């Protein structure tokens, strides 16, 4: 083996986001509906013979070089890479490795498409391919969750890791003790195509740290109104799944708008004046409804719109500071290959 590559899809959170956080799902059970899209985290892993470890993330202007050893301490520089390496050595190889790891994303960090978790999945998959580790979808996702949420202590849920490994449209169930059931949905091709025709994905040019927003949400779950809103969001995931199977796009749009309102009840920091202005602009130009993807407060927003009015909405959004992002829904999760 000289080179391993992986391509890992990002995801759109359609409904139920936030109910996959352990503080909620351990007690109430969480339901999430999401779908992977044709935007990716790209990873290349190259075996070295000189006893060096190199981490290279050009899209974040980050580069680190170390002597190979069994444990790399966190120092604020690409700690997520080091934590993955530490777990691979601890759990599998029991000895240090020498390699170069290069990654980049199709979208900016803090975009709300599950980028950090998708990155972890892609890197784990690269190591699994290199070392012939017997890791299936559930094992990769669970390991990615443990690295990000437990080893690094980054607050957040589990949907992103499972979306990245399984790919496609999925209805996910989250229970206590990190138990997750992923239900792949057999959505007809024409329904997925129509959903694409009715969706506009817009990057607001506002990036944010999801962990800060999720931390704020955690503190609000003791509030009765916030908890009721979380319960409502969970039910929205069930209702949206059913509407998707029926190709009931009107109901899909209604649920999306309702979920956005509930999301703002849970935490007031998920929106701001600029996002509200963009939302109103979208509605004024033909959108039925919309919401942010992910934790909120910035990143990508997506809107449901009548396809005959889609161009007008795109034209209006292109006059703003962000950009409209083309995409399609994908059926595959993380994939790897050797060259």
UniProtKB/Swiss-Prot annotation:
ATP binds at residues 57, 110-116. Coiled coil: none annotated. It catalyses: D-glycero-alpha-D-manno-heptose 7-phosphate + ATP = D-glycero-alpha-D-manno-heptose 1,7-bisphosphate + ADP + H(+). InterPro entries: GHMP_kinase_C_dom, GHMP_kinase_C_sf, GHMP_kinase_N_dom, HddA/FKP, Heptose_7-P_kinase, Ribosomal_Su5_D2-typ_SF. Mg(2+) binds at residues 116, 148. Signal peptide: none annotated. Its EC number is 2.7.1.168. Keywords: ATP-binding, Capsule biogenesis/degradation, Carbohydrate metabolism, Kinase, Magnesium, Metal-binding, Nucleotide-binding, Transferase. The keyword Transmembrane helix does not apply. One of its GO terms (molecular function) is kinase activity. One of its GO terms (biological process) is D-glycero-D-manno-heptose 7-phosphate metabolic process. It is an enzyme of class 2 (transferase). The active site is at residue 160. It holds the Pfam family GHMP_kinases_C. This is D-glycero-alpha-D-manno-heptose 7-phosphate kinase. It comes from Campylobacter jejuni subsp. jejuni serotype O:2 (strain ATCC 700819 / NCTC 11168). The lineage of its organism: Bacteria, Pseudomonadati, Campylobacterota, Epsilonproteobacteria, Campylobacterales.
